[in-house]
Amino acid sequence: MAKLKGGFQEGAIGRQPHYDTLKDALEKSKKEGSTFKEVDTERDNVLNILNELVPTFKDLKAYDDSKAYMNDGGAKGKELAAKYVAQVEKFDADYAKFNDALIKANTEQTKKQIEKLKKTVKKGYAAVMESTLRLTTLVENVEKAPKNADKQAVEKELNEIQILLKSINNDRGEVLVNSYNSVVGSVRQVLTDANENNLNDMIENFNNYIESYNNTTPDQFDSK
């Protein structure tokens, strides 16, 4: 992308993402329908820019593959590259909004599921779902703006999540608590020094926690 921002460069377009694949997937999801108005709206905005972006990508790729730049000194390539870069920047902004809408919808659905589980015998599973949801939000917020994080609020949330996890009184709960403790340590490191290594460690430990969570069936969190 950086090379294309400077104008047309031979071969640069070939290293760009395949936006046509995403376009096909979103069109398929649109046909299947959705119950979330905000998600639908943001998805349609992404599709609108993809309808402009994909043809530009194909034009630039064809121009590059045919070596037409040898005939016009790259003039059309510069024009297409500028058009492509502008469309990608708009796509990035629209896709970020779409992703936020998806996260919001998924979070709302998860919260509803947690409340239902709390009223059943699946209290351990409810606790781990709530813990994981809250931890995901915390890690995402710290990653986005580590230097602006409210350390006191983060510590309070970490302690509350730990209490929830420790309410799962079986070996699977212990495994998750151990994995969680690694996340806690790395989050605190980021709050002390938000360098790239510490941020990477936090994400790695969080991913390990999610892996432990995914490797456990719901019933195991309520087994004796």
Residue positions per predicted region:
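N-terminal Sec/ER secretory leader and immediately downstream segment
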Residues: 1-74
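Amphipathic, well-ordered alpha-helical segments in soluble domains
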Residues: 18-25, 49-52, 56, 94, ...
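Solvent-exposed, polar/charged alpha-helical surfaces in well-ordered, non-transmembrane soluble domains
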Residues: 41-44, 48-51, 55-58, 82-89, ...
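Solvent-exposed, amphipathic alpha-helical segments
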Residues: 45, 49-52, 56-63, 127, ...
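Polar/charged, Q/E/K-enriched amphipathic alpha-helical segments with strong coiled-coil propensity
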Residues: 58-89, 196-203
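Structured alpha-helical bundle/scaffold domains in large eukaryotic membrane-trafficking regulators
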Residues: 61-72, 103-114, 221
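Extended amphipathic alpha-helical interaction segments
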Residues: 77-180
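A cross-kingdom marker for long, charged
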Residues: 156-224
